[in-house]
Amino acid sequence: RIDGKACFVKGALPNETIEFRYTNRKRNYDEARITKVVQPSPGRVEPGCKHFSRCGGCSLQHLDHQQQVEFKQQQLLDSLSRGGMQAETVLPPISAPPWGYRRRARLAVQRAKDGKFLVGFRNAGSRRIEPITQCPVLTEPLPRAVALLPVWLSYLPSDIRVFEVELISGDNSIAIAVEASRFPADEEVPAMLDSLVKEAQGPVQLWWKAGKQERFSRLDSGTDNLCFAVTDDISLRFEPGQFIQVNGQINREMVAQMLSLLPE
């Protein structure tokens, strides 16, 4: 707080000394951005992704992973406290490796003036797209799918405007779910699928949504939906647009822990 008023400084970590500039001043709080780290926090680390400073996809890569876990746990406890709830027992947080875990990503798409496609996450606090050439938090094979998207999109009919593409990794396949201005005509679909299979070099599902349609429609000829295992004995099927936990390992461990806490 500065003179009793809350100031949220983007990129700042607890227990460090910084210089900053205001970016937005409001009645009840201010927003600011770091201009210089004078005395870094012991938990400050070098971000593992070259896009981190511009991309809006991640916000805590500059904080040590274990401290990220502790920070998020404390945020949850603080939120419960503000709601008048106190945890009787706090279990150790479940954590997993910080890289290669995320099994879905929603990417913005824009066709540049030269006809090439920009594919990536929005810049933090902006509508501008940060073109992504790598994303180390994505699980394999999604990083390869990110790389192929600009090439594959160039095969689409020029009058189709693509707004967003979601990449999803199931245990049995990956899916590319496209939100666009219109559906491809029946005669356009085979060429789109051929080019997708050529670029993906592996099993891939193609889903599409246009206009006011709420659910995605599948364009390839496959019949099996995406699936993921939540226990050794239970596997769930899902479609693009339906909720799943982005971290498969954490999901399985959470389910296992909840089952272990049930009375026998």
Q: Where do the model's predicted regions map?
A:
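Accessory RNA-recognition modules of RNA-modification enzymes
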Residues: R1-E264
